[in-house]
Amino acid sequence: MAASKQTSAGPLVGAVVQGTNSTRFLVFNSKTAELVCSHQVELTQEYPKEGWVEQDPKEILKSVYECIAKACEKLAEVNIDISNIKAIGVSNQRETTVVWDKFTGDPLYNAVVWLDLRTQSTVETLTKKIPGNSNFVKSKTGLPLSTYFSAVKLRWMLDNLRPIQKAVEEGRAMFGTIDSWLIWCMTGGVNGGIHCTDVTNACRTMLFNIHSLEWDKDLCDFFEIPMSILPNVCSSSEIYGLMTSGALEGVPISGCLGDQSAALVGQMCFHEGQAKNTYGTGCFLLCNTGQKCVFSEHGLLTTLAYKLGKNKPVFYALEGSVAIAGAVIRWLRDNFEIITTSGEVENLAREVGTSYGCYFVPAFSGLYAPYWEPSARGIICGLTQFTNKCHIAFAALEAVCFQTREILDAMNRDCGIPLSHLQVDGGMTNNRILMQLQADILHIPVVKSVMPETTALGAAMAAGAAEGVNVWSLEPEDLSTILMERYEPQIQATESEIRFSTWKRAVMKSMGWVTAKDPENGDNPVFSCLPLGFFIVSSMTLLIGARCVSTAEE
């Protein structure tokens, strides 16, 4: 029998999307931005102690190779030659920390995940040794001293794990976030693997100077981290090395972005003032501030958005996080038990079309930006005899939208550029009631890409546009038009403001329920790690083990 004829699909670009709960490999047509095929593998997490979250770096690596192999098989099934794949991009969960032996290629400990809380005492110790300038860390990194970021995780490893201490002493240790681990392994590992990261991941370590775009010696000295174990910092779009094994051996890895930056690129937010919001377990809002490094006065983080080429300028962003988005739906299902599947919330909310004066403040572990109030706890208020589960479901969806409104108001104040619309992605955007509510509460249009894989698309765009690959043009006139679903506000601005002001009254009532106590006495230590009352949403035990609702995972 004659072999079936293989077809040319034009230049294709692959994207590894390595998230907290799963790994995916997606293949795009670089001329149309269409998704050609994909494969996903679920991952396990380990919880050795309360508040600890770990993953096996080898399992993560294996999942990447499995996803690539299965996606290539799917291409073959439709007679597409895998030689059409010209480049691979990597998008990854940020901050998660790996240390490995450069001579054996073995991890020296499990990956310590971004939401791990074990470093609270480490943060307290470091806080006490901050120089006279209380903004010493934030002024260089845009970040507060927190358990969230990689430097304190690495400091804990060096303080507590003798195998890592010994490897550092003997010059065998390599440090990296997940992108570094994957790229090193995929480009050869012990046989010449490239030890690198990109600026969007480096800036989340708390060791990287976001002004000079280099590892900062003062920061490394402060955290007592040897600079010799750090990866080389590259742009988000350049050839780092070639795949040395697997179905795509010889294909260049030429794009690398932290997941939220990848979503920003995939949403094509290339202009100052453009913002995207990813709705998953929580919400991650990034606003492009252009080539200006804007420091927030309203509790937002300053971060690097992207640097799409060695000689291209760096773009900055303000980032705000909402802890409870999809997580509130999970709570309604698992704790409140008024639904059995997440999809039921939309149906319940549609039945009534209103909360009937019921407001839900999901401050399960305190309030976040712009309040930063650890004493708050979740409340449902405005209940009457008429209130039923449909109204509570509606109020839960409204809560996600009100929290987003507060973050975007903070961004508008920091940037001085009111948003004309909000671009959205993530699993919760499939909830049409939620999207309409968001437009009503923001009183600006909410724009959703019909193609939901924006994180993967951003990584693919960066890889395809790299010098030496050049199969994906990022020039405005060449960017593919992506179909958008648009939600326009359907209520008057005055009604929106009344509902929002009532929400803020409910927020005030949620405050002062608990007193932060000494964590050494066994009380909840979530907030002890952040100076001046500032804490990061990732330090939430509630989120540990929560299944990611988003297509773009942290």
Swiss-Prot record:
Entry's localization field: Mitochondrion outer membrane; Cytoplasm
Topology relative to the membrane: Single-pass type IV membrane protein
Keywords recorded for this protein, A-Z: ATP-binding, Cytoplasm, Differentiation, Glycerol metabolism, Kinase, Membrane, Mitochondrion, Mitochondrion outer membrane, Nucleotide-binding, Spermatogenesis, Transferase, Transmembrane, Transmembrane helix
Catalytic EC class: transferase
Knockout-associated phenotype: Male mice are infertile due to dysfunctional spermatozoa, which exhibit unregulated ATP production, disordered mitochondrial sheath formation, abnormal mitochondrial morphology, and defective sperm tail. Spermatozoa cannot transit the uterotubal junction due to reduced motility leading to male infertility. Spermatids exhibit abnormal arrangement of crescent-like mitochondria, which causes a disorganization of the mitochondrial sheath.
Function: Key enzyme in the regulation of glycerol uptake and metabolism. Essential for male fertility and sperm mitochondrial sheath formation. Required for proper arrangement of crescent-like mitochondria to form the mitochondrial sheath during spermatogenesis. Can induce mitochondrial clustering through interactions with PLD6 and up-regulation of phosphatidic acid synthesis in the mitochondria.
Family (UniProt): Belongs to the FGGY kinase family.
Protein's name according to its UniProt entry: Glycerol kinase 2
